[in-house]
């Protein structure tokens, strides 16, 4: 887990890099910037600990995280589907915190999320991946039905 870095609006340069702030909207994207000194890689999860406390998003492109955001780096092979599965679980735990409490890094490290496990008691990454693949397919099929008249 890594804390994001402060970047004031005055120091932002317009560009194509995502700037992830403490927002509950648009995957946390609050600006597109040219600044690239503190970019985090794709395939990570962002968690707001100030402002929109607990808002959690999977990031599929590199980005700059504001200083109100913590970035979670996986210690396992995290696919996009696994990231999309885990993000709402983290968000659920974060609901216990508010703007006044904040979800500081030291507190966040002590919190626990519950994951599905396999017969050996290890996280069932395969299940999480296939579950989200089905959710995405079902959602896509559902939306396609609205486009057919």
What spans do the regions from the language model cover?
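Non-catalytic DNA-recognition/assembly elements of restriction-modification systems
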Residues: 1-25, 118-149
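Intrinsically disordered, low-complexity regulatory regions enriched in Ser/Pro/Gly/Thr
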Residues: 11-12, 38-39, 104-106
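General detector of folded, globular domains
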Residues: 19, 49, 57, 71, ...
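Short, glycine-/Ser/Thr-/acidic-enriched flexible segments
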Residues: 25-26, 52
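A short beta-sheet element
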Residues: 31-87
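Glycine-anchored helix-breaking recognition loops at helix->coil/strand junctions
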Residues: 68, 86-118, 142, 146-147
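A generic structural motif
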Residues: 75-78, 117-121
